[in-house]
């Protein structure tokens, strides 16, 4: 009987993942989903959503849902390329070509680090370099020595 709740919880996780994987229908990274599970094009492709979904799909893969490993890899690749500012470092809040892609925030960078470090712990290709980039950017651009915070 103790296995019952665990099985029920994993069934719920599987339903959530089935819904969440629809975010991969976006052309860039992962898209914002409507409550119906379709991409909501009112929102630009963002670092935040891409990082959150990368984290989620990596956790899913770690839980044994191996079919989500490729989505975790997709997220790491998008964060490392499309959302990365090759000229000035760091990560754009939204993908270039969508709104003001020049904006950057510590919040977005923290989510990139969360996604990257989780992916790194699961051996996702490209995650090591993404961790290094996110961590160095957080400390070089957002760390406030005078306050001891980001």
At which residue positions do the language-model features occur?
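Glycan-recognition and catalytic cores of secretory/periplasmic carbohydrate-active enzymes
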Residues: 1-150
